[in-house]
Design a protein with these regions (language model features):
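Terminal alpha-helical anchor/extension segments at protein ends
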Residues: 1-197
Length: 197
């Protein structure tokens, strides 16, 4: 029986590898009996070496799609909280030591206007009125004259939305945490940079 189970688990691992080769996954989550799930995780780690593998112990054994969806959603939310907290701390630390990060609305706008934003982090999305150059599109808070081309700045209703759009258009990443974070001390916004500004 033990050999049969082991062969079955190897087949499961091989199937997962085939799926991984067909698609670009960043994480494999394994549910089921926790003892077998750990064995499957070890087998998969031998086959798929460059992808994260985790066991969803709370899932248990189920064939109910809603139970799987709930467990995966819960895992994703917990992971997002951990990752976003880590990103916020890294940005604040890098900013405070004068590295490749900015914090605060003015700093982020300045970096965005120079196409330097790599990852934009917003703790809680709230529309903020601002300015945009009518000539070159540069963003601002209260400037009368464009900081880049010295053109006329016009009023805009949602500066944060334009920062998000501009970051994505410039091949950056955007993370909206959806709650208060240590970035609140810096207008609730920060960014890691591609280059120093």
């Amino acid at each position: 029986v033990e050999n049969h189970v082991k062969n079955h688990l190897k087949n499961v691992a091989a199937t997962l590898r085939a799926l991984y080769e067909d698609e670009d996954y960043s994480l494999i989550l394994i549910g089921g009996n926790s003892n077998y799930a750990l064995v499957v995780a070890d087998l998969i780690k031998e086959i798929v070496t460059n992808i994260s593998i985790d066991v969803l112990a709370e899932l248990g054994i189920t064939d109910q799609p809603h139970a799987v969806a709930e467990a995966v959603t819960s895992y994703a939310l917990k992971s997002f909280v951990v990752e976003s907290s880590k990103m916020v701390e890294e940005i604040i630390t890098e900013y405070e030591k004068g590295g490749l990060a900015v914090a605060g609305l003015r700093g982020v706008i300045y970096a965005s206007n120079l196409y330097a934003v790599h990852q934009l982090i917003i703790d809680e999305y709230e529309p903020i009125a601002g300015k945009q150059c009518q000539s070159c599109g540069a963003l601002g808070i209260d400037e009368v004259e464009c900081p880049l081309c010295h053109g006329e700045m016009g009023e805009i209703e949602d500066l944060i939305d334009l920062l998000i759009c501009k970051t994505l258009r410039d091949d950056g990443d955007v993370f909206v945490i959806g709650g208060q974070s240590p970035l609140r001390e810096y207008d609730g916004i920060g960014a890691s940079l591609r280059f120093a500004v």
